[in-house]
């Protein structure tokens, strides 16, 4: 059987989301998948006439040429979604038209869940694209259930947790000082501005910090996915989202009930236990595998830190 994976990565735009896609590509290559290199290098926010012409060239010339080199494919793995809906539509249509391969999606995000906490407002176009798959690798059972509830009937398997390419050795001599780290896009983590910890220090990494944080929080800047593991020396890592301390509320908080954040994989690959919202989809994995703790309320954050030294 000849298996291919599409590589739509741009090394010049590596960030946390690109890290997740790059890791999937690396592990697929290690498993013997061949590469279909798709050089779609256009900034997602570029609406210029030049960008439109470039997309047209990609759709009419580049994509068909790429698929000619994979006309013997039995399986083509596609990382969903791409940044450009226009190119994603053309790529999927051409794979279906020009090859006999089974098209398998590895889901990174589903915008119908991520951007709308009212699931009646899901995108018809997104569901149409998802229905084009021959198979889907979803994050977990809650995401699979959502897909099925919205009419997706193709075979679906659950990933559970993303693998994480982490060359950094695990620190075997870590001091216990009730320390916690949080990494991510800080503009969507406004709960941090409300946190009041007495005996625990929280270290932050990520872009777009707030103008001010409480004294219990120390902001250490933005690091690349390659540099960040070198700095993870804390006792616990936090997975939380939204505006509130007593729940993961709002669009991003709601999404935690369905997705498997790549940062969870970063933390565990660094040998650090995770503290996560009890209603998050990943909470069951964390507790069943004894790799952290699930809590209902961030006001309880200091309890596992104090009791599990």
Listing of model-derived features with the role each one plays in the protein:
Residues 303-309:
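Conserved donor-nucleotide binding/catalytic region of nucleotide-linked donor-dependent transferases
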Residues 83, 142-144, 187-188, 274, ...:
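Alpha-helix capping/helix-boundary segments
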Residues 229-270, 276-284:
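Nucleotide-sugar-dependent
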Residues 1-91, 96-104, 113, 277-282, ...:
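N-terminal pre-catalytic "stem/leader" segment of glycosyltransferase-like enzymes
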Residues 164-233:
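Conserved catalytic-core segment of nucleotide-activated headgroup transferases in glycan assembly
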Residues 289-295:
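A short acidic/histidine/glycine-rich donor-binding loop in glycosyltransferase catalytic cores
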Residues 115, 131-156:
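A short, active-site helix/loop in glycosyltransferases that binds the activated sugar's phosphate group
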Residues 67, 94-98, 118-136:
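Membrane-proximal helix-turn-helix segments that form the acceptor-binding/catalytic region
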């Amino acid at each position: 059987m000849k298996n291919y994976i599409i590589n739509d990565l741009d090394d010049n735009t590596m960030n946390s989301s690109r890290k997740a896609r790059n890791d999937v590509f690396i592990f697929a290559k290690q498993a013997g998948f061949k590469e279909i290199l798709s050089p779609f290098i256009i900034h997602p926010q570029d609406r210029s006439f030049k960008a439109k012409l470039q997309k047209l060239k990609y759709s009419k010339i580049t994509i068909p040429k790429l698929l000619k080199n994979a006309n013997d494919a039995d399986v083509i793995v596609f990382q969903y979604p791409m940044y450009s809906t226009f190119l994603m539509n053309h790529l999927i249509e051409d794979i279906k038209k020009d090859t006999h391969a089974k098209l398998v999606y590895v889901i990174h995000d589903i915008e119908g869940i991520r951007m709308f906490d009212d699931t009646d407002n899901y995108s018809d176009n997104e569901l149409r694209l998802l229905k084009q798959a021959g198979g889907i690798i979803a994050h977990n059972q809650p995401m699979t259930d959502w897909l099925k509830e919205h009419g997706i009937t193709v075979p679906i398997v659950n990933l559970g947790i993303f693998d994480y390419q982490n060359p950094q050795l695990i620190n075997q001599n870590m001091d216990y000082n009730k320390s916690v780290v949080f990494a991510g896009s800080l503009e969507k983590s406004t709960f941090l501005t409300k946190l009041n910890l007495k005996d625990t220090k929280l270290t932050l990494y990520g872009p777009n910090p707030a103008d001010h944080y409480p004294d219990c929080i120390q902001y250490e800047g933005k690091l690349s996915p390659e540099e960040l593991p070198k700095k993870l020396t804390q006792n616990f890592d936090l997975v939380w989202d939204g505006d509130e301390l007593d729940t993961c509320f709002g669009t991003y908080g709601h999404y935690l009930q369905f997705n498997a954040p790549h940062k969870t994989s970063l933390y565990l690959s660094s040998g650090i236990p995770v503290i996560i919202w009890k209603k998050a989809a990943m909470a069951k994995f964390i507790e069943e595998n004894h790799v952290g703790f699930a809590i209902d309320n961030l006001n309880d954050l200091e309890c596992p830190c104090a009791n599990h030294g």
